[in-house]
């Protein structure tokens, strides 16, 4: 495979596209610009070692294999390392379904709005700390732990 990206990036893109292939108007995960979102989601949970473990379990020629072979490799890894596989898959889904392109496809297909879920079209007033004056004067009415 001639690709200017390094082997880890190529393997990751193949992994993403195998886990979430193109289907019914949805793009494959590896075709999108989600590696950054994927890495950020992984880092937020401190799961970099799990991703590294999964990538090391993939054969060097994983990206060059057929879709069926890649699926079989991942099924084998899922059977042997189910916790690792499940964690990585969750991060892939988080990155995929928050991608603007995927959200647009969802909106067209299902009518699910491709925007943040709350306060669409509503402007919130700037918070006024003075509105808490009365509460601050009250004695606590809860038990301290």
Where would I find each of the regions flagged by the language model?
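Mature-region segments of soluble proteins
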Residues: 10-17, 26-29, 33-44, 48-145
């Amino acid at each position: 495979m001639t690709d200017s990206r390094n082997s880890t990036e190529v393997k990751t893109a193949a992994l993403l596209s195998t886990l979430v292939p193109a289907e019914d108007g949805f793009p494959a995960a590896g075709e999108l610009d989600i590696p950054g979102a994927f890495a950020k989601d992984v880092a937020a949970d401190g799961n970099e070692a799990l991703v590294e473990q999964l990538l090391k379990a993939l054969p060097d020629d994983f990206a060059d294999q057929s879709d069926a072979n890649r699926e079989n490799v991942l099924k084998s890894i899922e059977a042997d390392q189910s916790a690792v596989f499940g964690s990585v898959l969750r991060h892939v889904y988080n990155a995929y379904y928050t991608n603007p392109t995927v959200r647009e496809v969802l909106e067209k297909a299902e009518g699910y709005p491709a925007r943040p879920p709350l306060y669409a079209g509503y402007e919130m007033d700037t918070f006024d700390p003075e509105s808490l004056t009365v509460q601050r004067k009250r004695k606590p009415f809860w038990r301290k732990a």
